[in-house]
Structure formats: C-alpha cells, structure tokens
C-alpha cells in the first residue's frame, strides 16, 4: 500500500477548485473524442512504491492527508471515478516529488469504489483494477496527469493457452493446500472473473506470489498472451517451491515444539498423579529425606547437628523455586556429606609396610624409617593421631610418590593438592556463604572426597605459596597445621567446627628459605637428597625401565637396556638430582624402538627383532650428549680451588678462580653473580689471608701493587651462601704462592676472620656432587662430622674425608708440600 505523507509539496497543489476545473476539461475532451468510450483517455496518475496492481483485482490502499487525498475525493464525487496507478522505477521514492521520468510507462487504470476516512486525516480507499494502461504523454506535471492508451486482452483461447491455464490452476490448487490464506483472494477473483480467460488467470496468479517488484512489473508490461502466461507460470512455480520449503520448516519447528510441550505436560501430569497416589514426593521432601539418610550413617557432633536441624527447618519454609532455597540446600548438602565420625581402618603391619615401601622406592632409608616409626606408634597407642611431615628435596626425587606410599601402607585415603602460586586464603578456609558460587576450602573438600576423617592430605609446593590482597594462604595454613588448633578448624563456608586432628599432613618443598618461620615451626622436616650414579642406576633397572616398557607396550624380549647404556645416559643426559629427566629419556628411547618394531611388522616378510640399547648406539636414539664433564679442570691450575655447593636442585661443584693484574694499589674484585653473603665471604677470606700470611708464607708480600680478580664460573647462575669461605682463601693462597692445589680435592666450609671453620648444610648433596665430579679428597668442617657419619656406607666408599676446625688444617691438605 502507498500513502502520501507530505502535504506541503511544491509539485502538487491540494486546491480542490483547480482539481475540479481540470476534471471538467478532461470530461469535455473525452466526450468529444468518443461518446461511447467508458474509460477516459486522460487520467490522474498515483505513483506506487512497493508492488504494481493487476487487472481483475480489488485493491485497498491507504492515503494520508495531502494532494493525492484531495484529488481522490474530487474524483469520487465526479462521474469520472478513474485514476492511474503506476510503479516508480526506484523503491521507496518520495511520491510527492516524483516526475514522469521516474515512473514506468505501463500501469493500470483503477475505478474508485469507496473512500473511508480514518483518524489522523488519512483514508482507506477501495479500488477496482480495470485495465492495463500505457502513458502516451504527460499533460501537466503539477498534478501528474497524463494521456493514456488502454490494452484489452485477446480472448481467443488456443490449445497451448488452455494447457498453460490448466497448469496454473493445478499449481494454484497445490498452493491452496500449503497456504489457506490464498482462498480469500481466490473467492474475490471468482466473483467477477473465471478461469476461462488466460490473461486474467495469469494476472491473478502473479498477484498471489511474493515475486519482486521488478518481476511483477515485467509481467504487467507483457502484452503478448503466450509470453505473459509463461512468465506467470514460472513465478507461480517458484512460489510453490518456496511455500513447500516454508511448510517443511514450519512442520519441523512445530513438531519439535509440540513434542517438547507434550513431554512437559505428560511429565507434569505424571508427577501430579504420583503425588496424589503417594508414589512420589515433592522436591523438598526428597532433599530432606536424602539429608536425613546421610545423617543416619554418621556420628554428627551435637553442635553440628543443631545447625543442621535449624537449616532443615528453614528449608521446609522456603519455596523450591527461590534462590534462598538453593543456597540453603547446598549448605545442607555440604554439612551432611562430611564424614562425621567415620575413620579409615588402619593396619599396623611393619613387615608388610616395609615390603611396600621397598617395592615402590629405592633408598630413602631415613624416610622409610620415619614411616615405620609412625606405624609403630599407631600400633602401641591404639590409634594414630595426626602428624605434620614436610619432605624437602630437589625435584624428581620422589616426594609426591612417598606421600602416596604412606597412605598405602596405613590403608588411609589419599588427597593431594598444590598450593604453588596460591594467593587466596579462601582456597584453604573457604568462602563466606554470602558470595555467589561460595564453596568450602580444600580441607573440607578433602574430607568429602576421602569420606574419612583421617585421610592423608598432601600439600604440594608449600615453598611456592603466594600472597595478595585476598589474604595470605600461608597464614591460613597455620591453623590447619597446628595440632592444638586443627581439632577445632573453622571453615568460612561451613561456619561449624571440624576436627582435623586425625589427619596426617604431608607437605613437600624444594627449599625451606621461602617458608615462613611460624609455619616451618609446625613441621617435622625430612630431607630427600639427590641420587648418586649407583642409586640412579638401580632405580632405572628396577623401576623406571620396567614401568616405561609396560606403558609403551613393549616386553623385555623386544628391548633391553645394557647397564653401560644406563650409566652413559645418567652421566651425559640426566645429571639432575632426581630421576625425572632420566625417566623421560628412557621413554624417548622406547618410543623410537616402538616405531621401528611397528615399521618392521608392516613389511611383507618381517622377522622378530630384539633391540639392545648400549652406550655405543644410545646417541642414535637421544642425539648428542647434553653434558660433557662436571669438571672444568682435570688438573687444577694455579689460583683455582674446587668448592662444593648445595642448591634447590641438589649438590654441585663450584670453582673459584683468582688472577692478579698490575695496579697502583692492592684491591680485590669479585664477579660471577655472587649474592650478598658470598660477597661478604670473599671480603672475609681476603682480610683473613692478609692477616695470616706471615704464618703461611713468611717472606711473601700480600699482592703488592696488584688487583686480584676472583671469579665464580657460570656467571649466568646466581650463587649465594657462606660455605665457599675456605675455598676462596685457598684460591687466593694458591695464586699468591704460585702453587696449584692438590688434584681431585673438593672442600666446603665457612671461615671467620680468625680462621675458624664453621659447619655448613647439605653434606649429603655435596658428597653426591663430589662423587659425580670424581673428586675423591674432600674437606668438611669438624662440626659436620656427625652428618657425615649418618650417611650410608655406599656413599662414603672410595672417598678420603678430612675434617677441619681451623684453616691451618685446610692448608695441610690443600698444599701438602708447603712447610
């Protein structure tokens, strides 16, 4: 429908007197030309924007107040009730400003049947479309009046047109089945037409379609009956295909919706029927029954039972659809799922425990001894109270697996979580229930998962715990790990005291330096040192190779590691303190072997092959060795001394190099990423040697006019600690005397300004590093004699140890020829 929206148009003047004058002139001219003619030769033209109309149609259009409305009112009162309807060339053109150049030449003549005014000054105009017209020439642009010619269809019905008509009628019938809305338009058409006129049938069928305005205008302009009905049939079939597709889509959607609605209604009816018959309870009753059933299997303390009963009473008053109901139900779910009073039954069998520990781990005698002590205490005291053990050692030495083994030998449930990088105390103590998505902390979650009040809880990477504005998790752990407090542990979410005193806590860390002292004070520290070559070799043979072979699907008959291959792998590819890299290299070799076996099996005539991994062919699987030697010098030069260090990754050798260059004054310079403590050690060593030189080297002057440069190789690696004190003095003395230190000597110890040698830590790790670097003469502080004596015999084999309490003792070992 088209309408006029602007009554102030400069082109059309809405003056009714002018319109009547022009209308009179038009009637006179029309009567002069032909008194018998029913349709006028001159018509006012009304532009159409959307779609053209076709003869034989009844068309209602909406006209807003303005020039066209005035023209239509005058025409309706006159004897000439006809107006021309012509489509604009461009869609959505401003019809008040349209000229004849912007209109198509072909349109229709319409008779005004009725004008029905409506609110707002507009009107609904009912038109009867009579004939096709063609604009011959405009008469006056101001009112878009034109001289027109008419086209009457040839009513001769040929066989071909009859066939076309039958096809169109058939398609219309199919359309009526798919879209019942077409029935009303069909009845209007049949009121003043019939299907025996092909032209009218074509026009009607095209009007039913949703074709584009250009396609419809093309049919309107086609006067040849055969061409017109052919185009009409094409558009009608397109409409049929579109209607079928639309109907198919609607059926699918309706089927889905109907099915869902049907299922919903049936379920609701079934639920209602079951409730009426007492066969099914409502959601609230089901929840309460579930909570009550849990409580019957638990020994809930009175203070907790009181809270649970209050919450159940509150739940009974809430609507199941409310948010508060969900919060209350979740809270009760957590309160009732905690295993109140339930404990795992322990087995205190020392022999069986020892077998399990030896089966799972090689070495680690101190750790195994502590576990056996734990079991013995539990057996004598008729129950094992909670303990807090912290396993400290480099990565890959088996800290986490030891925790699993402890749970296994005690027959307790095991729960592990890592606090590395944790910055929110709510992870430990839970969130307040006022927060959306609130939940208890890890401790309560551990109890829920283990369903016992005495599980083994492993807290990994406790040395890497963080802190933020959300709180300090390390401080939250203080309550958890304090035996005097954790029996009344209070989780923020539960807000009910929970007894953690029967939980065995096992913590792991690489270093102790970053653990807060109050937290460290609550733990029993057990150190796991790195492994030496012999230990790694046994671990690889007994544990790593069989396990990796099983994982990859190989057997011992298909691949075999020779001992020298494993030794070569340990020395040249996996020198870390643990065995993680070694395990990765073993799997890498086995994967390559698996590939070769499968490739061989796919050959037409394949034979079974056994792969023997030796030190000679190991490089074909792992590539070039990563490490060459831990020793920088096979023969120690002047000014160099070998120290022993201890890091979070295990023990290591530390070389101290000293050289002197000419300078105006005597001075010392230290490089090699040394920390503050090590810088102080170098100053102490420098000062001590200066003060004691007259005793060690009478007649020598202390580096006259020289600058001494002390360097610690591997400058990219930060180093710190006091244990290199005697090594620095030895390096400086070697430089001053121009005498090399005895070969294969390693040392560690802190020195004071008076020459006293103090004890240091990490004796086992340093001993392992010395063995790895083939140092067989070692100097340890006298204060560390006890630490050395506690080490297993296989670590001491082949080593000559000197214990010293003063640097005078170091001098005798490092420079045996010096008197």
From Swiss-Prot:
Keywords: ATP-binding, Cytoplasm, Hydrolase, Nucleotide-binding, Protease, Serine protease, Stress response. Residues 1-36 are annotated as: Disordered. ATP-dependent serine protease that mediates the selective degradation of mutant and abnormal proteins as well as certain short-lived regulatory proteins. Required for cellular homeostasis and for survival from DNA damage and developmental changes induced by stress. Degrades polypeptides processively to yield small peptide fragments that are 5 to 10 amino acids long. Binds to DNA in a double-stranded, site-specific manner. Its EC number is 3.4.21.53. PROSITE patterns: LON_N, LON_PROTEOLYTIC, LON_SER. Coiled coil: none annotated. GO terms for cellular component: cytoplasm. It is found in: Cytoplasm. It comes from the Bacteria. InterPro entries: AAA+_ATPase, ATPase_AAA_core, Lon_bac, Lon_bac/euk-typ, Lon_lid, Lon_proteolytic, Lon_Prtase, Lon_prtase_N. One of its GO terms (molecular function) is sequence-specific DNA binding. This is Lon protease. The keyword Hydrolase applies.
């Amino acid at each position: 429908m088209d309408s006029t929206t602007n009554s102030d148009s400069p082109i059309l003047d809405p003056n009714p007197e002018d319109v009547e004058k022009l209308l009179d002139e038009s009637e006179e001219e029309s009567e002069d030309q032909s008194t018998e003619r029913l349709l006028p030769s001159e018509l006012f033209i009304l532009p159409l924007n959307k779609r053209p109309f076709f003869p034989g149609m009844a068309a209602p259009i909406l006209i807003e107040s303005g020039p066209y409305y005035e023209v239509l009112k005058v025409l309706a009162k006159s004897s000439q009730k006809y107006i021309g309807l012509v489509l604009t060339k461009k869609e959505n053109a401003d019809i008040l400003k349209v000229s004849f150049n912007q209109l198509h030449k072909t349109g229709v003549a319409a008779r005004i049947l009725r004008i029905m005014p409506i609110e707002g000054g507009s009107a609904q105009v009912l038109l009867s479309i009579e004939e096709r017209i063609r604009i011959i020439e405009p008469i006056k642009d101001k009112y878009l009046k034109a001289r027109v010619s008419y086209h009457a269809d040839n009513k001769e019905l040929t066989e071909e047109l009859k066939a076309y008509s039958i096809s169109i009628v058939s398609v219309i019938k199919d359309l009526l089945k798919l879209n019942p809305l077409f029935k009303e338009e069909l009845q209007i058409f049949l009121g003043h037409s019939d299907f025996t006129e092909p032209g009218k049938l074509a026009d009607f069928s095209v009007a039913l379609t949703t074709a584009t305005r250009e396609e419809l205008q093309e049919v309107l302009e086609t006067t040849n009956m055969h061409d017109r009905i052919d185009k009409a049939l094409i558009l009608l079939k397109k409409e049929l295909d579109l209607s079928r597709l639309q109907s198919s889509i609607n059926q699918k959607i309706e089927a889905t919706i109907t099915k869902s609605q049907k299922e919903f209604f049936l379920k609701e009816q079934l639920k209602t029927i079951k409730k009426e018959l007492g066969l099914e309870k409502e959601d609230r009753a089901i929840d309460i029954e579930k909570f009550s059933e849990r409580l019957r299997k638990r020994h809930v303390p009175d203070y907790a039972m009181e809270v649970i009963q209050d919450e159940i009473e509150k739940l009974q008053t809430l609507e199941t659809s409310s948010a508060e109901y969900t919060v209350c139900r979740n809270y009760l779910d957590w309160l009732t799922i905690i295993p109140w009073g339930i404990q795992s039954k322990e087995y205190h069998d020392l022999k069986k425990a020892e077998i399990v520990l030896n089966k799972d781990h090689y070495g680690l005698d101190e750790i195994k001894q502590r576990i056996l002590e734990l079991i013995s205490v539990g057996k004598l005291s008729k129950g094992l109270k909670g303990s807090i053990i912290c396993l400290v050692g480099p990565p890959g030495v088996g800290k986490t697996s030891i925790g699993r083994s402890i749970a296994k030998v005690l027959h307790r449930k095991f729960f592990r979580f890592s606090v590395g990088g944790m910055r929110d105390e709510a992870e430990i103590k839970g969130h307040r229930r006022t927060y959306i998505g609130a939940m208890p902390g890890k401790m309560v979650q551990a109890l829920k998962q283990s369903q016992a009040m005495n599980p083994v809880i492993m807290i990994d990477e406790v040395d890497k715990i963080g802190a933020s504005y959300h709180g300090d998790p390390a401080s939250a752990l203080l309550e958890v790990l304090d035996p005097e407090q954790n029996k009344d542990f209070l989780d923020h979410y539960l807000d009910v005291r929970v007894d953690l005193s029967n939980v065995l806590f096992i913590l792991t860390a690489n270093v102790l330096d970053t653990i807060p002292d109050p937290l460290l004070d609550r733990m029993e520290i057990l150190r796991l040192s790195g492994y030496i070559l012999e230990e790694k070799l046994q671990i690889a043979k007994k544990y790593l190779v069989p396990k990796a072979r099983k994982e990859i699907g190989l057997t011992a008959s298909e691949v075999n590691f020779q001992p020298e291959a494993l030794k070569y792998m340990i020395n040249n590819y996996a020198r870390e303190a643990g065995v993680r890299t070694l395990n990765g290299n073993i799997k890498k070799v086995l994967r390559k072997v698996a590939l070769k076996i499968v490739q061989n099996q796919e050959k037409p005539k394949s034979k079974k092959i056994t792969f023997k991994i030796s030190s000679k062919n190991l490089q074909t699987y792992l590539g070039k060795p990563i490490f060459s030697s831990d020793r920088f010098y096979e023969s120690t030069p002047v000014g160099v001394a070998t120290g022993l260090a201890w890091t979070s990754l295990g023990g290591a050798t530390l070389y101290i190099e000293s050289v002197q260059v000419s300078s105006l004054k005597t001075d010392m310079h230290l490089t090699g990423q040394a920390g503050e403590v090590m810088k102080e050690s170098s100053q102490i060593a420098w000062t001590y040697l200066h003060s004691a030189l007259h005793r060690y080297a009478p007649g020598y002057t202390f580096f006259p006019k020289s600058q001494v440069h002390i360097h610690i190789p591997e400058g990219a690696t930060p180093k710190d600690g006091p244990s290199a004190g005697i090594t620095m003095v030895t390096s400086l003395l070697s430089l001053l005397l121009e005498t090399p230190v005895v070969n294969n000597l390693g040392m560690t110890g802190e020195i004071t300004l008076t020459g006293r040698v103090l004890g240091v830590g990490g004796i086992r790790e340093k001993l392992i590093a010395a063995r790895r670097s083939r140092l067989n003469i070692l100097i340890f502080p006298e204060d560390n004699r006890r630490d050395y004596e506690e080490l297993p015999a296989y670590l001491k084999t082949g080593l000559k140890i000197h214990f010293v309490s003063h640097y005078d003792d170091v001098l005798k070992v490092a420079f045996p020829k010096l008197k």
